[in-house]
Amino acid sequence: MMTRREFLQTSAAMTAFAMASPGGASPLSPLGAEWFDRPMRWAQLNLSEDDVAKMDRAYWLDFFRRIHADALCLSAGGVVAFYPTKIKYQHRSKWLEGHEDFWTVMLEGCRKQDMVVLARTDPHATYDDVAEAHPDWISVGPDGKKRPHPDYPGMWLTCTLGPYNLDFMTEVTQEIVEMYDVDGIFANRWTGNGMCYCEHCRQDFRAAYSQDLPLERNPRNPVYRNYLKWEQARRFEIWEKWDGVIRKVRPNARYIANSGGGATSGLNMKKVGELAPTLFADRQCRERVMVPWANGKNGKEYRSTLGNKAIGGIFNVGIVSPYRWLNSTKSPAETRLWVQDGMANGLRPWFNMVSGQLHDKRGQKVIEDLYVWHYKNEKYFRNTSPVARIGIVYSQQTAEFYAGAADMHRLVEDPQLGFYQALIEARIPFEMVHELNLDAANLSRFKTLILPNIAALSDQQCQQLRDYVQKGGSLVATYETSLYDEQGNPRKDFALADLFGASFVSRANGKTALQNTYLYPEKSSPLYGSMLKGLEDADTIIGGTWQLNVKSHDEAGKQPLLRIPAVANLPMEKTFWTLDKTDAPEVFMNQIGAGRVVYFPWDIDRVYWEVMAYDHALLLLNAINWVNNEPHPLRVQGQGMFDATVWLQKDSMTVHLVNLTNPMAMRPQMHELIASPPQDVEVEIPKGKRVEKVHALMKTGAVQHTVNGSTLKFHVPSVLDYEVIAIDLV
């Protein structure tokens, strides 16, 4: 039997291919009045109220110079004004008295170093005097009671959908940009504190829909669906109002929202990508059980709608969550790999320091090391496009209208993570694709799309996928993909049944997961060799926990995996099998014109994420390789786990290898860096280009290589944490 590594290393001879830039993405903007693409290394000082008197300004300005930071985000207003505000009810820091204008000192110091400067605001909380004067500004729970701040007595959570944001914070925003020559306002925690039932929210929602606010978040409730639409519209109304106020005063300045993410994000990422001139992924560190590639995943998700706009990756050197050790320092190994995985996936580093007073200076060195190295190699991080032929689709409408908050992880995030993990282990480059970017222009660069239980799809989206397959694209889909419309309403059959080669009959489950299920590999199937590669000696394979009963459109015997009915798991004496197999296929493999489609009517992706079964990884990768039907643009052979990516720049391309081979990879912190075994790399050179030079950026020095046709081959003796191989092209 093949080992897993041997299987992953197996690939056919590579054919030449053209590398396209991301669909819908505009070229990188030139440097000039629009500053958005200029900064490569960000700093943020998330100030404490007493910092205006106690913070060492000279230290920080010198630190920014040493690390080549070219942008700063500095706390300005909202909860606390760090400048001499004249606005009633904006709480001025009591440490301002008797000191020079803190903001003027910091702004002038940064401008002397040619730094971009954003002013940070935070509208999520206010004080007793405001609550007494404007009780309608305070967030209200479904019980009708005003919400006190959970962490700080004497403060209150604000309603961020009403006049507090629309009027008061608009006034704060305008005052800041009138007083200071900033490049924009960065608003933190501006999207609220949960559903608000204040008089403004109740009146405004009723005016829009003639309904009362829903009391629970139930995606099946049409009133709650209306609330989601109303909330989205109000958020974007606030966004555009603040942006308009800023640009009226300073035409080159913009509003930058601290928002965004993947399928579980609360704001429509398509709209976010259209509005934002730049954005920052705020996933600052790992917590509990989180994979080290989660930072890079955030970068892919943001890029799916922002295209080539600059995206920063916010990180923290401390152990922030869940117990909020805000001024702490974690292991340098953990910080390095977290930031490096972001760099490898197109994120520009942004460190966030809570308080300008350093209570533990150990974190400064790792920031300096990362930033100085990044500065020295900056031209190889000014990317024009990623190189990937596979895209994982993520769906916010599936999360909101089908899964809801209670089932969001099981039905949405976990299936996606299963495919993501399998591709990481196989070192296959891929991108994320937003559900509203399924038009031909955006999909033209992909050979294969993965649909991990993308249950809620409109008729138009399904037609876009159908057109994509007819033009030679391929799909891998799972479980209830296309069984619901975009509003989460169930369909009688899959909208993509014609592509799946199967129709929905019923659910095999009740309300609980199945146990002790199995699959039978059907060796007589003509597709057995393609789906069971690496599993030739398997008599049975574990099955799913959530399964659908479906009816095949094809003759019996074609498909290579059949269902074995669930078997009792207790008492042990009753665990005998009643059937060795059934005629029910558990995978459907179809050739449709030049395209191919694989459909699994069960939760293979979700189960892989939870259980990490070796067999399921092979099935997922066999499905991807069969539909993709072309070698991957990057092949990396060797032991270990890497996040491997490829990028194009103006006159070069780069291969990024982030070494995730570590016993703490699935825990909150890595304690040490562990060098990888040797890796052999093959990468395809763009058509019309010739290799001039190949060199390593981390270990520094020329890399011996060979070129055979369009294929560049080289050997990497070892990777400690991160290696970037730069390939200069002519």
Predicted feature locations:
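Aromatic-lined carbohydrate-binding/catalytic grooves of carbohydrate-active enzymes
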Residues: 67-100, 128-137, 201, 268-278
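Short, acidic/polar
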Residues: 51-64, 166-175, 264-269, 332-336
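Carbohydrate-binding surfaces of carbohydrate-active enzymes
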Residues: 220, 224-730
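Active-site-adjacent "subsite" loops/lids of carbohydrate-active enzymes
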Residues: 123-180, 217-228
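Aromatic- and glycine-enriched glycan-recognition loops and surfaces
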Residues: 49-67, 91-113, 237, 414, ...
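N-terminal structural segment of carbohydrate-active enzymes
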Residues: 29-82, 113
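N-terminal export signals
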Residues: 6-25
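Glycine-rich, aromatic-flanked loop segments that form ligand/cofactor-binding clefts
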Residues: 42, 70-74, 102-148, 254
